[in-house]
A protein has these predicted regions:
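ATP-binding pocket architecture of kinase catalytic cores
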Residues: 27-139
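An alpha-helical support segment within catalytic cores of ATP-dependent transferases
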Residues: 4-19, 132-191
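A glycine-centered beta->alpha junction motif in the catalytic cores
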Residues: 90, 96-110, 129-133, 153-161, ...
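Active-site Asp-x-Gly
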Residues: 201-252
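A conserved long alpha-helix in the C-terminal portion of kinase-like catalytic domains
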Residues: 230-291
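Active-site acidic catalytic loop and adjacent metal/ATP-binding pocket
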Residues: 33-41, 175-221
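Regulatory N- and C-terminal appendages and interdomain linkers associated
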Residues: 1-16, 294-317
Length: 317
């Protein structure tokens, strides 16, 4: 049973001694696996309390705290990331953490104003430039291209088992996974779950949260959300912004498109699992539309531009 906002406020007060919280509201919709609330203090600052509800959320919270240690030096006038305020345990030995919380506005993909996603691209470039060695020391998960490819093959098989994913899409994705050249990239530190729940804007600043999915993996994973909802021109502008800060292999955008398509099937599978028929129907319709475009050869190619990625070419030269 989910904890009430009063219990969460009491736990927050214990974790963040010295803070005087004056109001509390539940925030469980955007924090699956956690009991969560947003609190406001007598100094008008906002905070988020997170309480784990099982082994999976315990592991995710551990990653979140380690990730924040890694990413906090990047906080600046253009990037807001949560600050760890305090920690404790509740009577069930569940972890309780209080983080700073900045309210933000949603980033509208496809909007004429591309500045927010350009800002996101720039900050992703900085996150992707973080030290992999430091991430390893913090025990953040590390996936090689081979590991990730195997995981994706297994996931596509499970999505196929739902019987809801059109065959033309499964064939498209399986062909992409078999294209060795497409998966030539340098594993980097990534956020791991960029979407409307984890990024937003506050004035000229990007607000980023949800670092519990951070890992060392494919940088293209962080561009799946952008690739799935932006115009081609906006995507190219974002990629250009990214390349001003760090290098990328020439197939990053193709893999981002791959991830954006697979994410629809993931969402469909999740909706079926939780019994949300309406959301599942909508996701199924999106997949059918995607399948129609695939049959008409109207989807971007997922075929690798070359066998050897940009970074590997430069490493070997």
């Amino acid at each position: 049973m989910a904890k009430s906002h009063l219990i969460l406020a009491a736990l927050a007060a214990e974790a963040a001694r010295g803070k005087n919280f004056t109001s509390t509201r539940l925030n469980t919709e955007k924090t699956p696996g956690f009991d969560s609330a947003i609190l406001e203090s007598d100094t008008d600052r906002k905070y988020q309390v997170l309480v784990t509800t099982g082994k999976q959320s315990e592991a995710e919270l551990k990653t979140e705290l380690n990730a924040l240690k890694l990413v906090s030096p990047l906080a600046s006038s253009t990037l807001s990331v949560p600050e760890i305020i305090g920690e404790t345990k509740d009577s069930d030995d569940s972890s309780v953490v209080v983080l700073s919380f900045d309210e933000s506005k949603d980033i509208r993909l496809g909007a004429k104003n591309s500045e927010p996603i350009q800002l996101l691209s720039a900050e992703l470039a900085r996150i992707h430039s973080l030290s992999v060695a430091d991430a390893n020391e913090l025990e953040i998960q590390n996936f090689s291209p081979t590991d990730l490819n195997a995981e994706l093959v297994s996931e596509i098989d499970k999505l196929a088992d739902t019987g809801k994913v059109p065959g033309v899409l499964l064939s498209r994705w399986e062909k992409a996974l078999e294209d060795i050249g497409l998966w030539r990239y340098r594993p980097t530190v990534i956020h791991g779950s960029i979407n409307s729940d984890t990024v937003g804007t506050a004035g000229d600043k990007l607000v980023m949260r949800g670092f519990g999915t951070m890992r060392v993996s494919d940088p293209a994973e962080d561009f799946g959300w952008i690739a799935g909802g932006s115009t081609e021109q906006a995507i190219n502008t974002c990629l250009a912004q990214y390349l001003e800060i760090r290098e990328a292999d020439e197939n990053l955008l193709k893999r981002a498109i791959f991830y954006s398509e697979v994410e629809i099937a993931r969402w469909l599978s999740y909706c079926i699992e939780i019994g949300d028929d309406r959301a599942a129907e909508a996701a199924g319709a999106d997949l059918e539309n995607l399948a129609e475009d695939a049959q008409k050869s109207e989807l971007p190619s997922l075929e690798a531009t070359s066998f050897i990625g940009l970074n590997q070419q430069r490493d070997e030269s």
